[in-house]
Amino acid sequence: MTLNLGIVGCGGMGFRHMEGISELMRYSDIARLEAICDLHESAAKHVADIAEKNNGYRPKIYTDFDSMIDESGIDVLDIVTDTKTHHSFAVKAMNKGIHVLTEKPMGVTLKACRQMKEV
């Protein structure tokens, strides 16, 4: 089974996470980078360009998070955004049955982290 992955956040860490996913894809068919999302379309396009070079196909680009989780068919979401957004992105994705991975810290408050754990 191949897991369809999505990345939200295309800054420096998002780029590095894409590189790591690309490396995984070179040696295994367990994952496929399916979608990339960033508020700044130019950042998402840049990461998608490199992903296409690395992987031989271009992931779908989104500038709207809700559209990505509704339309892309991802199984796993890699959240690589500003810490204050980890909670809201994670809860939305998990409520749709999407597994999540967040950069650390998981959330800005213990309450937010507990809410994420409960979903």
Show where each model-derived region lies:
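Alpha-helical structural signal in soluble globular domains
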Residues: 20-24, 47-50, 92, 96, ...
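N-terminal Rossmann-like dinucleotide-binding module
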Residues: 1-54
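Beta-loop-alpha module in the N-terminal Rossmann-like domain of NAD(P)-dependent dehydrogenases
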Residues: 54, 59-117
